[in-house]
Design a protein with these regions (language model features):
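Non-heme Fe(II)-dependent double-stranded beta-helix
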Residues: 1-134
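Short coil/turn linker and secondary-structure boundary residues
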Residues: 23, 48, 146-149, 175
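Hydrophobic, aromatic-enriched interface-forming segments
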Residues: 133-171
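Conserved small/polar residues in nucleotide/adenosyl-binding loops
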Residues: 172-179
Length: 184
């Protein structure tokens, strides 16, 4: 197992690791160390079914269910931990997943929760030939690079928002976390 570091401020590719197999504690420790150092890890050419994806994910802690979606549909009811993200529609024109074309604009996952998940795992079944258009930002570095005057102005402040709308401003059909006292 190896880490190939990106030249960017975050990111790295994990080499020589088969995620479909049960990981040893040494491998889990290695991945945690790499993740803490690089913030985003890429594992190419993996072959995981839904169970194996969940088993791999559980190596890093308890899994959070996905947030609400605008369709009010559980796309994989047998795997409630998995959020299907797709721009594909079935024959009837119904989306087969969340975040279709136009919705997945710049965002941070599930930050409306009191304690947002510490990580997300994105497993791509199909990747465009141009490698898609997904980007990640090092928000710790962004904060560190702010002018001291701005840091003083915002330190101690809290932002409150909810999940009533998605990133494309579509109203979700699921209840807002505010209704259950879960908002941030």
């Amino acid at each position: 197992m190896k880490l190939l570091k990106s030249t960017a401020s975050l990111g790295g590719e994990i080499l020589e690791m088969d995620l479909s197999q049960k990981l040893s504690q040494e491998q889990i420790n290695f991945l945690n160390q790499c993740w803490n150092d690089r913030l985003v890890l890429v594992f190419k050419k993996q072959n995981l079914d839904d169970n194996k994806l969940i088993n791999f994910s559980k190596n890093f802690g308890e899994l959070d269910p996905p947030g609400p979606n605008p369709y009010g549909v559980k796309f994989l009811p047998e795997f409630p931990e998995i959020n299907v993200i797709s721009n594909v529609k079935n024959k009837e024109g119904t989306p087969i997943g969340n975040l279709g074309d136009g919705e997945a604009v710049w965002h941070a996952d599930m930050t409306y929760q009191e304690t947002p998940p510490k990580a997300g795992i994105l497993y791509a079944l199909e990747v465009p030939e141009n490698q898609g258009n997904t980007h990640f930002a090092n928000m710790t570095l962004a904060y560190d690079e702010l002018p001291n005057k701005l840091k003083q102005k915002i330190d101690g402040k809290t932002l409150i928002h909810d999940s009533a709308h998605n990133s494309a401003c579509l109203l979700y059909t699921s209840p807002s976390p505010r209704d259950s006292g879960k908002s941030r």
